[in-house]
């Protein structure tokens, strides 16, 4: 096992740092074939079947071509749970877990203020469903609805909800179009929309550029807040009194995003930093 690990690690070092290459090689053997780090360090002898050899060779070719390990394995970890992923969805990032934590805190505050209230939460642009599923599992009494424009993404999200036992309602919806929803029908809207300007693409890692869905990543250079304005407008029309809109953002546009929320009629816009000190989230509330 140690020789397989070493060979893969050495090949991956052409694309990644030594630490990243080691982590990916460990992940492939552990999550793909059930070979633990202990087995690797002990150089435990295990014969791969013909099928396992074929799968391993295919995985190695995909990894060496720069495909993210999460797509190669078909899964990624988020908030302590394993989610299925494919090139139809973004790979969940640890920073987004902080948005989920904030949403849970706000939802619990809304529930405490009105214990009889049946909370309705929307995850706009759900992708893999990691936000919606995590919220439903943390807030089992809430109704959670997840939107996405991509049917491929919705299929992955539905699979994750079913696997993890989260009763989430999924809808194919373009958040840029008029929402056509009743006033005061949603208590909390959470979103991690596309926010990377096309001009930033040249600074991004090539495995992200080549493999993750561009429609879920990028916005035009001349209109970086297009999704945030749509979210703010829709939220102002549909949030209940004291309901909230919470979003992940491009750290270059924190104050502009907060201003867009206020201009749409929301109040008390707040910028929150992530664990690395970057402006990562903006939230605002509906008026009384």
Where are these regions (language model features)?
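Alpha-helical elements of Rossmann-like donor-binding domains used by nucleotide-donor carbohydrate transfer enzymes
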Residues: 7, 27, 55-58, 98, ...
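An acidic site on a long C-lobe helix of protein kinase domains
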Residues: 52, 92-95, 227
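Helix-turn-helix-type domain boundary/helix-start signal
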Residues: 14, 46, 89-90, 247
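Short helix-terminating capping/connector loops at secondary-structure junctions
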Residues: 18-21, 112-118, 241
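N-terminal auxiliary segments of SAM/dcSAM-dependent transferases
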Residues: 1-76
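S-adenosylmethionine
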Residues: 138-143, 147-288
């Amino acid at each position: 096992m140690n020789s397989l690990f070493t060979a893969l690690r050495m090949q991956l070092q052409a694309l990644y740092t030594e630490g990243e290459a080691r982590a990916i090689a460990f992940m492939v053997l552990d999550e793909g074939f059930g070979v633990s780090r202990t087995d690797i360090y002990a150089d435990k002898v295990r014969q791969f079947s013909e099928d396992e050899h074929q799968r391993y060779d295919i995985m190695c070719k995909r990894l060496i071509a720069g495909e993210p390990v999460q797509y190669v394995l078909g899964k990624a970890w988020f908030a302590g749970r394993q989610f299925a992923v494919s090139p139809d969805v973004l790979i969940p990032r640890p920073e987004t877990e902080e948005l989920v934590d904030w949403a849970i805190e706000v939802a619990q505050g809304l529930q405490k203020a009105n214990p009889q209230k049946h909370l309705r939460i929307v995850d706009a642009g759900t992708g893999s469903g990691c936000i919606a599923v995590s919220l439903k599992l943390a807030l089992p009494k809430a109704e959670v609805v997840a939107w996405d424009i991509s049917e491929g993404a919705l299929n992955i999200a539905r699979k994750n909800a079913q696997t993890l036992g989260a009763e989430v309602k999924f809808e194919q919806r373009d958040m840029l179009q008029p929402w056509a929803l009743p006033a005061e029908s949603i208590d909390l809207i959470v979103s991690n929309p596309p926010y990377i300007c096309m001009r930033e693409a040249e600074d991004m890692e090539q495995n992200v550029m080549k493999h993750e869905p561009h429609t879920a990543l990028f916005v035009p250079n001349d209109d970086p807040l297009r999704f945030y304005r749509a979210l703010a407008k829709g939220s102002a029309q549909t949030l209940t009194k004291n309901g909230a809109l919470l979003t992940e953002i491009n750290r270059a546009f924190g104050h502009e995003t907060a201003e867009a929320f206020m201009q749409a009629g929301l109040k008390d816009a707040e910028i929150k930093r992530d664990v690395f000190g970057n402006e990562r989230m903006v939230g605002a509330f509906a008026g009384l």
